[in-house]
UniProtKB/Swiss-Prot annotation:
ATP binds at G12, M13, S14, G15, A16, G17, K18, T19. GTP binds at D62, M63, R64, S65. Displays ATPase and GTPase activities. The lineage of its organism: Bacteria, Bacillati, Bacillota, Bacilli, Lactobacillales. The keyword Nucleus does not apply. This is Nucleotide-binding protein SSU05_0620. The keyword Transferase does not apply. One of its GO terms (molecular function) is GTP binding. It comes from the Bacteria. Belongs to the RapZ-like family.
Length: 295
């Protein structure tokens, strides 16, 4: 891990997408904090410097008074010359009409609208934030951006600072008899394949064991299906990554989640990890063994 701290200060107009932005940075592997008082930033950075957990930080700072701006300006001047710190200010903006529409949709009041008129609060906030916007290295206008598109823009601008992939694939096996995985994006059913359970010498093994893996894969229908499966999955992965999805969960299921699905999930993970960041898990692989031991 680099010794240099990478800090992104996220600010901008209320309703312009700061919540989506900070969630996007979290997906990119940043340590994130929402609504940090500017005066606490130097002390916070001092603590982070002594921590080995993460060298990438993104935090939201809201400017809601003239004193807040003077505070953040003093803090930025203080940290600007630090040799071990690379920091940027990301400013999120949108047109007044779009911000008004968003507030009406959520039925929330603007934090600076003392008389309840949203537009008055927006105009006051824009006046207070103008100097900070002018000194920001990154300005994103979210007027025409959906939350998904904003995530994509942030990923394109900031993911390059991260040496680790921002898109991860989770390949898992499971048993249909125990229920579908709630977090699965893609589910594939291999219950139509010959079942090793009916081979007594294989019954107590799993798809991770060579005899079971070989038995599952030696059948022509297994090879044909796997070829189609890999051919389906590989072309769509760049699309999921392009859309800003941080984790894609691919689940392969058989009856009990011990033999066929485990073998297929293992082979799929082995092939995908040649080009992608892949984690693997086998939810129900040992469930039958645990049930037998309890009985």
């Amino acid at each position: 891990m680099s010794d240099k701290l990478h800090l992104v200060i996220v600010t901008g107009m209320s309703g312009a997408g700061k919540t989506v932005a900070i969630q996007s940075f979290e997906d990119l592997g940043y340590f994130t904090i929402d609504n940090m008082p500017p005066t606490l930033l130097p002390k916070f950075l001092e603590l982070i410097r002594h921590s080995q957990d993460n060298n990438k930080i993104a935090l939201v700072v809201d400017m809601r008074s003239r004193s807040f701006f003077s505070e953040i300006r003093e803090v930025l001047d203080e940290i600007e010359g630090a040799e071990d710190l690379d920091f940027k200010v990301l400013f999120l903006d949108a047109t007044d009409s779009e911000l008004v529409a968003r507030y009406k949709e959520t039925r929330r009041s603007h934090p600076l609208a003392a008389d309840g008129r949203v537009l008055d609060g927006i105009q006051l906030e824009r006046e207070l934030l103008a100097p900070l916007k002018n000194m920001s290295q990154n300005v994103i206008d979210t007027t025409e951006l959906t939350p998904r598109n904003l995530r994509k823009v942030i990923s394109e601008q900031f993911a390059s600072q991260d040496n680790q992939p921002s898109f991860r694939i989770e390949v898992m096996s499971f048993g249909f008899k125990y229920g579908l995985p709630l977090d699965a994006d893609l589910v594939f059913d291999v219950r139509f394949l010959p079942n090793p359970y009916y081979k007594l010498e294989l019954r107590n093994l799993t798809g991770l064991d060579a005899p079971v893996f070989d038995y599952v894969m030696e059948h022509q229908e297994s090879e044909e299906f796997y070829s189609h499966l890999l051919g389906l999955i590989e072309p769509i992965l760049p699309g999921y990554q392009k859309e800003g999805k941080s984790v894609l969960t691919i689940a392969v299921g058989c009856t009990g989640g011990q033999h066929r699905s485990v073998a297929f999930a293992k082979r799929l993970a082995d092939d995908l990890e040649k080009n992608w960041n892949v984690n693997r898990s086998h939810r129900d692989k040992d469930r039958r063994k645990e049930t037998v031991n309890r009985s």
